[in-house]
């Protein structure tokens, strides 16, 4: 019965294509009602099929879960991470589809966030992949929902095992058996962003009235789908249960001015706001489980029993003898026993992955209790829960502690507590109503939080320069969604800064309108960032932008952040925690941004915390903060960088008209002919000089490929020519036609012309070649290293494995190197026994992919023995001298494998 149930599921019958077409209709529908109708139709048909399939069975576990986990992939908890993002998917598609790396489609996938002006899909990788895949895929796929889930399970488990080869194999199966439309939705499921235009709350409400509430207290999608399969049957008691993760209660941001009103003019509790990881602990005797605020299981890290983990062994004996079962809510902190202090989360450690030999130890700071000995406490008041909490365990400093609280009545007490938190470099404070009950996944139902950055004027703000950008995704597609900001190296007195160190990436704080306007302002200045040739004026750490902007064309933004924390991702060696843009400093010039010295001073001021000011009560009893003086604005000095100045050609005498009305842009010259000399000579021959190439520029002259030249090459709008061509023109006093040897880069039209005139090595089809030109052509021809048959065999094997052709019978021996016992004396070729069956076997082995050798040496994988076993002992003696041990098999292994079209188990044929 159990076997039949597992094989007979709705998911194993419903085509994945049906789910995708439903999702497509939901996405394309305009109104909410129409979106709901399409989802309800799919859900109803599933339930009807379920009833028909299982009409003779009771207590079946089959449910809507296989489809729901694909519709709401962001709520998936059973499946581990895929380890796949858009860029990795792009590279896999390019490899699996064998797309030319520099081809149009490959570049579309790799640069999916870059606006192209077509389709309007910038930032939507799934849509871009759809258009690339459409001409290459099936019209309709053959996979069921169950098969898709199985393959996704395989990808997740192989990612955990770091088996990239098996991940590729599963992805290849998905690609070859699904249509472009199905893959579009599959990509969105893997990335966990379906863009349906309908919330998870709406999906839950259509599925069942109790679904959202049950998910809040269990975070278990499968349990929701199983328990609420019948929409007519509700749950009488939806409450927190042991060993089932729930979404914790959250705090809303408080307005200090209204704090007494929010607390209903009654007394309230003030607690320290801890800067750790929110974690719930479930305990039943010696069994423990730990869950994060999003329902992820961290039991392996903290310990499932008193004998394992970074926490459980140290706190198990702290619980009172009469406490068998409990559920606690608190913050997991890192504690330094040497300094007896808690570490802030911004420093370089991860409490969820701390190793045993760390100088820090895990400490659980508990502030709530939800169950004790099977008694549920969620509906008890906070005051009552606090009383119970104090009787559950004996605190152990640095291991398990109760978060201390103070009782308060007034706004002034809140301000004093906040100022004290600022002095102690703490994150902030919590304010809680004593009569509040615990409401999972609810924010602000009696719990409030106050952090210095929420209060105007308490934070030191940073004026930093935008130096890079990142294209947006989703609703921000086609515009810059994040910016890379930097501080300046302090320049010599009287000069402007020329080098900038990256500090932080920032994207929040801006409205869509502000983001759009800022992007529009900087749009014409963005340039592609090339990792191998970065701009010399912008120094980066490991974090690199997608595009950059010359500092002199950029703007300063005022940033507010919680603190400055260490980071090797940025050149400054630190970054900002929780940065957000406050405003654009239109009143400041680009060179007036913060310097490295300013940053170091601010960093040392309050241990990196950017809140160092106190909140004060003014005369009108309203919170006030001290105003800071605005920095005096420096007078603008307008000038042109020296190397961009136009040359002074007033004293040049014209000697020829060969370049009359021809515009040149000279980027650089040679050692013997520097840039000014070339410009003077061009003017002598009647040409015009510009410092930046435009639509009328005939060509760009470059003696070396600096950053400006590389950017011109990337634009693909201008021909870039060596100074040697100019010198040839000057020497002959004629307009010498271009030849391949003169060219650094050709724009498309020139490239097309050259393709008609020259072969790929630069040899003209029509003009006679002299000896020197022929030598030059030959020097440009690289030797093609022909591969040996052995190397080709290895290459073929890799290709067969990559594209799953290795299951073909014709390649079954491809990775085998075989020696056949055809010689009376091993390795003596003159003693070959002619006309034996083994000679035929050698041909069959080669036909089916094997490499057959006549010399027994290191690297042989198999030795095949015929009827004569007299040399077996000699072969075994040989084998003992080899690093890699070969297998000695009967010839029937070859015969049986070929007859049955697959490799047979070798152990049955061993000699």
Curated annotation (Swiss-Prot):
Q: Which SUPFAM superfamilies match?
A: ATP-dependent DNA ligase DNA-binding domain, BRCT domain, DNA ligase/mRNA capping enzyme, catalytic domain, Nucleic acid-binding proteins
Q: Which InterPro entries match?
A: Adenylation_DNA_ligase_IV, BRCT_dom, BRCT_dom_sf, DNA_ligase_ATP-dep, DNA_ligase_ATP-dep_C, DNA_ligase_ATP-dep_cent, DNA_ligase_ATP-dep_CS, DNA_ligase_ATP-dep_N
Q: How is the cofactor bound?
A: Can also use manganese, calcium, nickel and cobalt ions in the ligation reaction.
Q: What is its EC number?
A: 6.5.1.1
Reactions catalysed, as given in the entry: ATP + (deoxyribonucleotide)n-3'-hydroxyl + 5'-phospho-(deoxyribonucleotide)m = (deoxyribonucleotide)n+m + AMP + diphosphate
Binding of ATP occurs at: 271-274, 278, 331, 345, 367, 427, 432, 449, 451
Sites binding Mg(2+) 2 sit at 427
Report domain BRCT positions: 654-743, 808-911
Q: What keywords are annotated for this sequence in UniProt?
A: ATP-binding, Cell cycle, Cell division, Disease variant, DNA damage, DNA recombination, DNA repair, Ligase, Magnesium, Metal-binding, Nucleotide-binding, Nucleus, Repeat, SCID
Any idea which GO molecular function terms this record carries?
A: ATP binding; DNA binding; DNA ligase (ATP) activity; DNA ligase activity; ligase activity; magnesium ion binding
Concerning Pfam families, the annotation shows: BRCT, DNA_ligase_A_C, DNA_ligase_A_M, DNA_ligase_A_N, DNA_ligase_IV
What compartments host this protein? Answer: Nucleus
Under the heading CDD domains, the entry gives: Adenylation_DNA_ligase_IV, BRCT_DNA_ligase_IV_rpt1, BRCT_DNA_ligase_IV_rpt2, OBF_DNA_ligase_IV
Primary site of residence? nucleus
What is the tissue localization of expression for this protein? Testis, thymus, prostate and heart.
Residues of the active site are: 273 (n6-amp-lysine intermediate)
Q: Tell whether Metal-binding is among the UniProt keywords.
A: yes
List cofactor names only. Answer: Mg(2+)
Q: Which family does it belong to?
A: Belongs to the ATP-dependent DNA ligase family.
Function field: DNA ligase involved in DNA non-homologous end joining (NHEJ); required for double-strand break (DSB) repair and V(D)J recombination. Catalyzes the NHEJ ligation step of the broken DNA during DSB repair by resealing the DNA breaks after the gap filling is completed. Joins single-strand breaks in a double-stranded polydeoxynucleotide in an ATP-dependent reaction. LIG4 is mechanistically flexible: it can ligate nicks as well as compatible DNA overhangs alone, while in the presence of XRCC4, it can ligate ends with 2-nucleotides (nt) microhomology and 1-nt gaps.
Q: Which disease is it linked to?
A: LIG4 syndrome: Characterized by immunodeficiency and developmental and growth delay. Patients display unusual facial features, microcephaly, growth and/or developmental delay, pancytopenia, and various skin abnormalities. Severe combined immunodeficiency autosomal recessive T-cell-negative/B-cell-negative/NK-cell-positive with sensitivity to ionizing radiation: A form of severe combined immunodeficiency, a genetically and clinically heterogeneous group of rare congenital disorders characterized by impairment of both humoral and cell-mediated immunity, leukopenia, and low or absent antibody levels. Patients present in infancy with recurrent, persistent infections by opportunistic organisms.
- List the NCBIfam families hit by this protein, alphabetically: dnl1
Protein name listed in UniProt: DNA ligase 4
Organism of derivation: Homo sapiens (Human)
